[in-house]
Each structure stands twice: as C-alpha cells, then as structure tokens.
Amino acid sequence: MLTPSSIADCWHSLRQQRPLVHVVPNLVTANDLANALLAVGAAPIMAIEPAEFSQLPNRALVLSMGTPTIDRMQLLAQAGRAAQAKNLPIVLDPVGVGATVWRKQAALALIATVQPTILRLNLGEALALLDQTGVAHGVDVGHAWHDPRLVAGQLARRYGCVVGLTGVIDVVSDGMNWIQLEHGHQWLSQITGAGCIVTSLIGALAAVINDVMLATVSAIAGFGMAAEVAAMHALGPASFRVALFDQLGAIAELIDNSRLSYRMEQHDAD
C-alpha cells in the first residue's frame, strides 16, 4: 500500500545502502545529476568509456538522451547492454524526443535495444513516442488536451515498462494502474535539468527497491515535496535552484512530516 511511510522508507534505504549509480549524462546537466545523487545518499559514477561498463559494480543505470549524436547513441546502447547483462534496472530519459525526426528514430532504436525498466519523460515526449504529435519545439512542450494518465498507461503498455510522466501533473503507470502525484512548484519549469534530476533519483531508488513502480513514485513525490519546501526559502528561480539541492538531502524527513497528495486507480480496459 502506498503511504508516506512506505515512500520515506525507500529514501531511508537509499541513504543506508548508498548504491553506486552509473549515469551516462547529457552535456547540459551532468554536474547537476552527480550533485543530486550525492545529496540523497547515492554514489554517482559518470562513466563514458565502454571498456568500463561491464566492470562497474553499479546497481542501476541512468541514460540521458539530452545531447544526442550518432556516437553518443551508440554509447548509450553499449551501457544499456552491459546493464542488461548484469540484470540491472535501466532508467531512460528520452530528452526532447519530439524535437526532430532523427532524434525520435534514435530514441526508438535505443528503446528497442536496451528495453528500459523505466521511462521518465514529459507529456510532449510521451506523445512523440506514441506517434501522436509532430516535431516539437523544446523539451518541455505541453499538450493540454491529452490526459496524462491515459498517455502514461498507453506508453507503459506499448514498451512494457513503468512510465514516470512529469509536468504540471505527475503520473506513474505500469500499464495496469496509475498514480497521480500532486506535488512540485512552477519554478521547476524555469531551471535547467529538473527532469533529468528526477530521472537520476528514480535510478537511485530503483537500485535499492525491487518494486520499480514504488521506486518511481517515491522519487517523483520526494522531488516534488523538496521543490515545495525549497520555494518557501527562495526569492526566484536562481535561489530556488540552490534551495532545492539543500532540500534533496532531507527528503525522507520531509515526507515523514508532510501530507502526501496523490490519486491511485486502475486503467480502464482498452
């Protein structure tokens, strides 16, 4: 059963176990992801040499498509295959997948190769993977006329994974059930890398929690709560960013002392 205590327990387990999380980052947010993982108690390694991949004692893999090139997509695929061989959870963030036809085709090929355990993305990116939108401008394009709960469920069923869809409304789905989370702050859309940070936190929790649905929900809920508290101590997006990193290290305590706001239901049959 989903409760504040079950989510807080995930974060306590993370800090106790301090798992090594392998992140193949994009060129924009690598430093943010490393610092976020350190803040919550994980141990990040941002290895990009394929010869190392099979040798790393990592317990999860996080892949970011944010700055794709042909060589970089091959690198992501190699990291994914190494994680598959070790039976590790793989979290994929198909950043800006709707921006160009090339990027979308590259993302689809990567998904087919690595078969991610979890996809973390926004609504516009999800629609691109479902072929329900054309080329998008930017990575945070919204589509208000689509129900994110239905989109998340469709995506989860199509690719056989858990989907963490973040934005104005956060939804997590395994294709059968969906959980809508109601935490966060508008300033998250005004700083670079918020979504990428959530992706890395999902990877950290999936490293210590076998229930990947719970790990994804816990990461998104905890990050949203941290953002809410950070906003109380900030004057604007710049100071909010600093305050957010301060709060990441206290997520378990925030959840213990906060009201978890969520809805959970089963998807209707198609």
Curated annotation (Swiss-Prot):
Catalysed reactions, as listed in the record: 5-(2-hydroxyethyl)-4-methylthiazole + ATP = 4-methyl-5-(2-phosphooxyethyl)-thiazole + ADP + H(+)
Cofactor(s) listed in the protein's UniProt record: Mg(2+)
Tree of life domain: Bacteria
The UniProt record gives the binding positions of ATP as: 120, 166
- Any GO BP annotation: thiamine biosynthetic process
The top EC class, named as a word, is transferase
Keywords carried by this UniProt record:
ATP-binding, Kinase, Magnesium, Metal-binding, Nucleotide-binding, Thiamine biosynthesis, Transferase
Q: What Enzyme Commission number(s) does the record list for this chain? A: 2.7.1.50
Q: List the disulfide bonds.
A: none
CDD domains to which the protein is assigned, alphabetical: THZ_kinase (cd01170)
Q: Which residues form a coiled coil?
A: none
- Give the NCBIfam families listed for this entry: PRK09355.1 (NF006830)
Per the similarity annotation, which family is this?
Answer: Belongs to the Thz kinase family.
Q: What is this protein called?
A: Hydroxyethylthiazole kinase
Q: Which organism is it from?
A: Herpetosiphon aurantiacus (strain ATCC 23779 / DSM 785 / 114-95)
Which taxonomic lineage does the organism of this UniProt entry have? Bacteria, Bacillati, Chloroflexota, Chloroflexia, Herpetosiphonales
